[in-house]
């Protein structure tokens, strides 16, 4: 039996190619775009990509995440150093949303993820990232290089979530370095066990939501430097420079702030 005839997508007219692309998911688009210079060039011309929001998730693997507006599926392209996972596809469901994760093995996952993200950012024309979720004590040896890379390759991140796996690891310096180098626009949620009272990381200004757990180290003065404050029941109100009000709630595990 003859092998199936390949579909000559590159011979189609541009509008027809675009229709074919609309039927592809982001992982298929990436796979197509890395075949050759020509396929990359074609992928770059597609106009409908802005509908995807994009995230970077760093934990045991380094993932690039896509989420379409409207459809309840998110796709993860995960770089792993575990060869047994190569080519595996995991499917999960969370809050009615389907999560599809494709694994790719690499001897040097950090390096390959960096290259892939650069490529993807170019194809999907993204200057900013919607979500950054980092377990700061994963890839410890490459902590600085990952942050420097992010600093150069994305303008800002909208939502940022910081985690830590092992409370024994001191991540104070790492976290301060991250906060100094990455611009966070609307939300920072922080689950780290920072305990160093000298922690001198900069907390981003103008956030709509700030949530810090395990925050024994955290001096309120750090937040109060620029604003007018008064205590109200159930929280501390801060009138921000832009006229909005932020309310702080102190919990036994930490505190949170929301702007309204
Ligand atoms: C990181 O990966 C570990 C192991 O798979 C998992 O237990 C943990 O929940 C993950 N952390 C985050 C923040 O996703
Ligand atoms: C895309 O490429 C990855 C990595 O090579 C592979 O595991 C996956 O099966 C491919 N996915 C599709 C939908 O072609
Ligand atoms: C990077 O991680 C190492 C531990 O592997 C730590 O000693 C160092 O302080 C960290 N540096 C920064 C800037 O995060």
Language-model segments: residues:
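Non-core capping and flanking segments associated with repeat-based/extracellular domains
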Residues: 1-260
